[in-house]
Amino acid sequence: MAPPKPSAKGAKKAAKTVSKPKDGKKRKHARKESYSVYIYRVLKQVHPDTGVSSKAMSIMNSFVNDVFERIASEASRLAHYNKRSTISSREIQTAVRLILPGELAKHAVSEGTKAVTKYTSSK
């Protein structure tokens, strides 16, 4: 006799069995890194009573990754042009000035400078 079919409402997904490797140890899940914790912290600083959906968080995470990649590649290009093997805060600052438009670049540079100063003074 076939088992009864679960109703559509409240149906649970079948539990996935973890296939054991030959040495008998369970495989660990690969950690998925994201900026969601930090995005959430900033949101709570700016708007304490506002929440964020998982879809919106995913979009914000993609945005942060995209901006990070653009700045990193531009800074890398600048270091290569100047025959440097190390990306310093100067390359990052120049990359930010090149990538971000007008007033946004000015604010980003001042916040970045403030963060670097705070970091170096705490050492």
Curated annotation (Swiss-Prot):
* Position(s), cross-link Glycyl lysine isopeptide (Lys-Gly) (interchain with G-Cter in ubiquitin): 118
Q: How is it modified after translation?
A: Monoubiquitination of Lys-118 gives a specific tag for epigenetic transcriptional activation and is also prerequisite for histone H3 'Lys-4' and 'Lys-79' methylation.
Q: Which Gene3D superfamilies match?
A: Histone, subunit A (1.10.20.10)
Going by the entry's taxonomy, the superkingdom of the source organism is recorded as Eukaryota
Q: Where is this region: Disordered?
A: 1-31
The record's subcellular location field reads: Nucleus; Chromosome
User: Does the keyword Nucleus feature in the UniProt annotation?
Assistant: yes
The record, for InterPro entries, names:
Histone-fold, Histone_H2A/H2B/H3, Histone_H2B, HISTONE_H2B_site
Q: Output the Gene Ontology terms for molecular function.
A: DNA binding; protein heterodimerization activity; protein-containing complex binding; structural constituent of chromatin
- Any GO CC annotation of this UniProt entry: nucleus
What PROSITE patterns does the database record attribute to this sequence?
A: HISTONE_H2B
**Which keywords has UniProt assigned to this entry?**
Chromosome, DNA-binding, Glycoprotein, Isopeptide bond, Nucleosome core, Nucleus, Ubl conjugation
Which residues are modified by glycosylation?
A: 110
**Complex and partners:** The nucleosome is a histone octamer containing two molecules each of H2A, H2B, H3 and H4 assembled in one H3-H4 heterotetramer and two H2A-H2B heterodimers. The octamer wraps approximately 147 bp of DNA.
What protein family is recorded?
A: Belongs to the histone H2B family.
The function of this protein is: Core component of nucleosome. Nucleosomes wrap and compact DNA into chromatin, limiting DNA accessibility to the cellular machineries which require DNA as a template. Histones thereby play a central role in transcription regulation, DNA repair, DNA replication and chromosomal stability. DNA accessibility is regulated via a complex set of post-translational modifications of histones, also called histone code, and nucleosome remodeling.
Q: What is this protein identified as?
A: Probable histone H2B 3
Taxonomy of the source species: Eukaryota, Metazoa, Ecdysozoa, Nematoda, Chromadorea
- The gene it comes from is his-41
